[in-house]
Amino acid sequence: MSDISKASLPKAIFLMGPTASGKTALAIELRKILPVELISVDSALIYKGMDIGTAKPNAEELLAAPHRLLDIRDPSQAYSAADFRRDALAEMADITAAGRIPLLVGGTMLYFKALLEGLSPLPSADPEVRARIEQQAAEQGWESLHRQLQEVDPVAAARIHPNDPQRLSRALEVFFISGKTLTELTQTSGDALPYQVHQFAIAPASRELLHQRIEQRFHQMLASGFEAEVRALFARGDLHTDLPSIRCVGYRQMWSYLEGEISYDEMVYLGVCATRQLAKRQITWLRGWEGVHWLDSEKPEQARDEVLQVVGAIAG
């Protein structure tokens, strides 16, 4: 697309970053100054009743800056990148029609990628094929299925861990249904985002600072009643660790503690480690992201001013 045709598109802002980097605080500050409306881009914040462990904006913050796409699913329900793209595009169109600018804030990089580049035309899930894969896994083990994936799609196999049955079964399912590999199909993007996007990433300047923030926030969550929150989910009886909601960092470790698999101290240690690993993956995504403007979360006023400098011209 030419620069001239891009300039005629409606404007949007992406505010991305690893967990515990101060994205929400900056987004709320920007809403006070710019004509923006916030859309959450977070695969954990979509779930109702999962507030403390996801660091969901509190009532006061939401009053100051309402976020769209929060609390839109029960923890028992799935929500895909395709679901997000559909919902986000609808919200963006609504915001643009009102003469304001969508500000998309969060850390689920797959959602940002799906929104920006479109989605590949992957086949829908087939219960019969999935059942056949699970039967084979029960008989031969997931390691065997991972070797099978290596033979047909070595690129996907290198990316998917043998202990990740959900992604492993999906990669094989796609191949069995379509005759094409997941790698082949995902190289064909769908429709690009029909917006002129200003992209920002916020993170502390050093990894040590981010690690400190993550540890502090995890302990803060525990002090705020995180265990009671997960106990309420645990007591429902219909939730389990195969669900994306319960696999969220922190929740999975607390769940293991409630099931008696690990001690409280192990839960805290593993929860912090899992959150650090998530942050590392998010930063890896962002380092390979084209056209992103980096902000230092340790200098919030400077970060705010840099955003205003880049996008200030679109606020009028």
UniProtKB/Swiss-Prot annotation:
Keywords: ATP-binding, Magnesium, Nucleotide-binding, Transferase, tRNA processing. ATP binds at residues 17-24. Transmembrane segments: none annotated. GO terms for molecular function: ATP binding; tRNA dimethylallyltransferase activity. It is an enzyme of class 2 (transferase). It comes from the Bacteria. Its cofactor is Mg(2+). Belongs to the IPP transferase family. Monomer. This is tRNA dimethylallyltransferase. It comes from Shigella dysenteriae serotype 1 (strain Sd197). The gene is miaA.
